[in-house]
A protein has these predicted regions:
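Generic protein-terminus/edge-of-domain signal
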Residues: 1-68, 72-104, 309-313
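DNA-recognition helix of C2H2 zinc fingers
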Residues: 283
């Protein structure tokens, strides 16, 4: 498992690409901000205007564009450049594994797109390290293949279709992040992802993410990074926003959160498995990071699982 795989696992992400928008004539589709949710729009055909919260002017989306909001920034999709035609409503229906959102009748579609949604642990580092808006092109063969699969599933009512579109969301997220990271130094990043971009820190970060339970002292970390203590402390803080020791502690807690929700291991066992020396120390560190005790975090999983399905504000 590489570092991107691990960060996605620690984020505890679930999702689906189960909404298809087929818009004609005039239409208006607002999307509100939701905590611990991400949204992606994949433009298959046509074009649209999109007004994003905090931006003075609407952007234009065209066929082949993919726009991703890791933290579901508030935005409006519209047929009009002003994005203020709120009287033009959207009709919603179900067709197999997909929810179909449509407008108008007859004529060519002015916009054909798929919407993906992602839900994740609200502390998910990978989703907070990305910028508010990620815009990439779907000209990569892997993304083209994924869109073709979505189009096929939406055009045919086949058994197991829902499982396929749910699984494709995981593939889509990896492809989005991978494509964005491949843009290089011009792509704004924060936290762990920004640290990974620095060759001097990459090996250290990758090793800690893969083995947080190891004993991590400053001597071991400086040796792995081939930096002096002062250099490591300064560079790590500069690139990630936290100290090396805080980073180790953070990854241990993220791994613990996964174990608390996915296993029945005791809190003590979880603490020891991720590198803490005592349940007391672990409990204090966990509550400082998550605001609740490890036991309460585990209990909250049942409430999260029973939460209402995701829906757009249309």
């Amino acid at each position: 498992m590489d570092t991107l795989d691990k960060l996605i696992e620690l984020a505890q992400i679930t999702g689906s690409v189960d909404i298809q928008c087929l818009f004609r004539d005039k239409w208006y589709a607002p999307h509100g901000r939701r905590r611990a949710h991400g949204i992606a729009h994949l433009v298959v055909a046509g074009e649209s205007y999109i007004k994003i919260e905090g931006e003075p002017e609407a952007r234009r989306l065209k066929a082949g564009d993919l726009i991703f909001f890791p933290r579901s920034a508030e935005h409006i999709l519209s047929s009009e450049a002003a994005c203020n035609n709120c009287g033009d409503t959207i009709h919603i229906s179900n067709d197999g594994a997909f929810t179909i959102e449509s407008s108008g009748s007859g004529g060519e579609k002015s916009l054909d797109l798929f919407c993906a949604r992602f839900e994740y642990d609200e502390h998910a580092d990978i989703m907070h390290d990305l910028p508010e808006t990620v815009l990439i092109s779907m000209d990569h063969p892997s993304l083209q293949c994924l869109v073709s699969m979505l189009q096929y599933e939406s055009a045919h009512t086949l058994s197991g279709s829902r499982a396929i579109v749910n699984a494709l969301s995981s593939v889509l997220l990896v492809l989005i992040v991978r494509a964005y990271l491949e843009q290089g130094g011009e792509a704004p990043l924060g936290g762990i992802l920004n640290g990974l971009r620095d060759k001097r820190l990459r090996q250290l970060i990758q090793t800690v993410v893969s083995r947080p339970e190891d004993e991590w002292n400053i001597e071991k970390m400086t040796a792995l990074a081939n930096l002096s203590r002062a250099q490591l402390m300064r560079l790590f803080k500069q690139q990630t926003g936290i100290s090396p020791h805080a980073f180790v502690n953070l990854i241990r807690l993220r791994q613990a959160a996964v174990l608390l929700r996915q296993t029945a291991d005791s809190v003590l066992s979880v603490a020891l498995n991720v590198g803490f020396q005592s349940e007391t120390h672990f409990g204090k560190a966990f509550k400082k990071q998550y605001g609740i005790s490890p036991g309460q975090y585990r209990k909250n999983e049942a409430a999260d699982t029973a939460a209402l399905p995701f829906s757009y504000d249309i």
